[in-house]
């Protein structure tokens, strides 16, 4: 069964937001819809078919018995990458990429063997070892597990890489290119698409967007496993642990791309608003003057900026749960609610939209 998704899902996840116009890579020009508030807007009409190609490549690779390596070492991608790879019985690197991880697999294999040996020693209680020696082994295991835990069972170089943030993972991509391993990647407007076999133009920073990409790739891998088992003549119904089939949450979840596709004009319209609260690594365009909020002096605004809040639309999208968390994290002592920042922010957003 093909993996279905819609353009609306990409929009709601913020996949259409690129970077500030001055930070762009000119090679991404063909994938840019336009500019809004000095932010490049990615053409999701190209993202949708590109993602379909990447998903098909993943499914085909796994169906043929191949291995997919998820690569994403940035903070907001690390946990999501690991969860998606584990769920789909694939492999991942979510800590620092070690030089030679692909091109010097023999050395990496030696480190993996060491990890297994240390793990076995600790599991047996380390007979004959002093307390200090066991402590040293535990620390060594933690270090090796962090670096190699996601590939310790891979058994060889992968057959395809799925990458989040091609700028950060350049070394991984270069090694894959050197070995002729195809690469499917999320490519933002500030990235170089060279060396990517399956270019998926989309935002590579928003946590919600990253979660969507990883979920789709994981489902494609699971689809490949199902196809492989079906073609081998395996009776899935007779298995002691049959493959779990993920059902849509409702009848609308399996809608096809064509029936839910949005007009490109909607992309520009939604670029000015968002339906969910998120923290940003940097402002999208010029930051808003948050000192206009009741009781928000320069020091408080600096706190908000340091936490990743730069715009009124972020505050306007806050739920009561978001308000409580941010208030507690920044020690604002109830100021967000007390001074009605959310309603004020919504007013500023509406005024800007009407201008």
Curated annotation (Swiss-Prot):
One of its GO terms (cellular component) is cytosolic small ribosomal subunit. Signal peptide: none annotated. The keyword Ribonucleoprotein applies. Pfam families: Ribosomal_S2. GO terms for biological process: translation. It comes from the Bacteria. The keyword GTP-binding does not apply. InterPro entries: Ribosomal_uS2 (IPR001865), Ribosomal_uS2_bac/mit/plastid (IPR005706), Ribosomal_uS2_CS (IPR018130), Ribosomal_uS2_flav_dom_sf (IPR023591). Gene3D superfamilies: 5' to 3' exonuclease, C-terminal subdomain, Glucose-6-phosphate isomerase like protein, domain 1, Helix hairpin bin. Keywords: Ribonucleoprotein, Ribosomal protein. GO terms for molecular function: structural constituent of ribosome. Belongs to the universal ribosomal protein uS2 family. This is Small ribosomal subunit protein uS2. It comes from Methylobacterium radiotolerans (strain ATCC 27329 / DSM 1819 / JCM 2831 / NBRC 15690 / NCIMB 10815 / 0-1).
